[in-house]
Every structure is written in C-alpha cells, then in structure tokens.
Amino acid sequence: MLRAHNLHIRRGRKTVLADVSLQLEPGEVLGVLGPNGAGKSTLLGALCGELSAHEGDVLLDGEALSRWSGTQRAQRLAVLPQVSTLDFAFRVEEVVGMGRLPYQSGRVRDDEIVAAALRAADAGHLSGRSYLALSGGERQRVHLARVLAQLWPGQAGQTLLLDEPTSMLDPLHQHTTLQAVREFADRGAAVLVILHDLNLAARYCDRILLLEGGRPVALDTPQQVLRPESLKAVFGLEVLVQTHPERGHPLIIAR
C-alpha cells in the first residue's frame, strides 16, 4: 500500500505541491485531474521517489521508499512516465520483457507474462516488430504492457502509477487501455492514473483527486468531485453534468 502524508515540494522559492495526503487502496483506481501546471506529474514523481519532498513523507507498506532496495521496490511499484524514451531497435517483446528484470522467474514464465501483458494492452499483434518502427500510440501501448508485465498479474500490495497513459491514443485505445488498468486493479493492485479527459476519469476511476496550483481541491468519488461548480473553478469550463444513461457515472458535457 502506498501512502503520502502532507507532501510539500518546492522548486527554488516556488511551492509546486502542497498539503497533499492520500492513500492508494488495493483494488482501487485513483484518478488525478487538474489543469496544466497543477502539480500532477510532480505528485507522481514524489510518489515513485524520483522527487524528494521538502516536507511530508511517502510510505510503501509502512516503510519509507528510501528503505526499500531497488529490486524490492520494483516488485511492488511500477511507473509509466508521461514520456518514455528508447532509441534502440529492440523488438517489441524485448521492450516489454524489461519489466521482468526485477525477477528471476525463468525465460519460459517471463515469455508467458510478456505475451499476456501485450494482449492486455491490445498490442499482441505488434510482437516481433521493431520498437522504432511503431507509431507514438503503439509505443505508448507497448510501454503500458511493460509496466503491466513488471507487476503481472497484479495483486494486493502492488501499485501502478501512470502519467497520461492515453495521451497519444485514438478513442478506441483510450478505452482499451483504461479497461486493462481497471482489470489490473480488480485483481488487487492499487492504481493511480493522471488523466485530462473528464469523462474517462468518471467512467474508470473509483476516486478522483482534483489539483489546482499544486494543492488539492477535492478527493472523493467522481459523483462528488465532478460537479459543475468545481470544474468551473478549476478549469474555467462551463459544463453540464448528467448521469450516464447506461452506466450511472457522471457524464460531462461542455456548454
């Protein structure tokens, strides 16, 4: 379980994240929303240990992140950054196989997991191709498969952090990606995902953290967070919020 308490992060004299406390629960997808510059990626950097908090702490299973060895942490915590750079002509399955480096589970088992993770990311048909020959959206799905393989099949005690995993994807693959994330959480893992699409967050997230100016505005269910007054205050956007006629989650329509 990953928990953050009273996080504050500064860059120079500017506070870029303040007063953030949260706990990622097993089986939960927590969405993070906010305008550009709200502190979403900074929060993810602090949660994975890439950025050090000036105040507050981040605990993984009750222990400070710094107390875990790299291998121990990698078996419990996987991170998909906003941009994943790779300039070598690895085959797709080799890229996904990098997620298995923290383990010694054997080639046969690793190959099975890589194939399963590629299928989960709707990227199985890309196997055998050069990573460099892929489109931006295809690369994004391959990297999703990599972090899924790192924690496969997903269980309580494991945490997946995703920074805008749908940013390069067409509408179909936005949904297949978040369906894969949802299924991963349903097997017991905790997931935090940064999104910009309000309706995707409403459909796939159990709770939503709304950030503005580096500070939390709300942390609650989609029904409680995605209200017209909150979205107007944070995004400057006039919206109608209705109930989805089939699924029951909020449906946000720009006026």
From Swiss-Prot:
<dbReference type="GO" id="GO:0005886">
    <property type="term" value="C:plasma membrane"/>
</dbReference>
<keyword id="KW-0997">Cell inner membrane</keyword>
<dbReference type="Pfam" id="PF00005">
    <property type="entry name" value="ABC_tran"/>
</dbReference>
<feature type="domain" description="ABC transporter">
    <location>
        <begin position="2"/>
        <end position="238"/>
    </location>
</feature>
<keyword id="KW-0067">ATP-binding</keyword>
<dbReference type="GO" id="GO:0016887">
    <property type="term" value="F:ATP hydrolysis activity"/>
</dbReference>
<feature type="binding site">
    <location>
        <begin position="34"/>
        <end position="41"/>
    </location>
    <ligand>
        <name>ATP</name>
    </ligand>
</feature>
<keyword id="KW-0472">Membrane</keyword>
<keyword id="KW-1003">Cell membrane</keyword>
<comment type="function">
    <text>Part of the ABC transporter complex HmuTUV involved in hemin import. Responsible for energy coupling to the transport system.</text>
</comment>
<dbReference type="InterPro" id="IPR003439">
    <property type="entry name" value="ABC_transporter-like_ATP-bd"/>
</dbReference>
<keyword id="KW-0547">Nucleotide-binding</keyword>
<comment type="similarity">
    <text>Belongs to the ABC transporter superfamily. Heme (hemin) importer (TC 3.A.1.14.5) family.</text>
</comment>
<dbReference type="InterPro" id="IPR003593">
    <property type="entry name" value="AAA+_ATPase"/>
</dbReference>
<keyword id="KW-0813">Transport</keyword>
<dbReference type="GO" id="GO:0005524">
    <property type="term" value="F:ATP binding"/>
</dbReference>
<comment type="subunit">
    <text>The complex is composed of two ATP-binding proteins (HmuV), two transmembrane proteins (HmuU) and a solute-binding protein (HmuT).</text>
</comment>
<dbReference type="InterPro" id="IPR027417">
    <property type="entry name" value="P-loop_NTPase"/>
</dbReference>
<protein>
    <recommendedName>
        <fullName>Hemin import ATP-binding protein HmuV</fullName>
        <ecNumber>7.6.2.-</ecNumber>
    </recommendedName>
</protein>
<keyword id="KW-1278">Translocase</keyword>
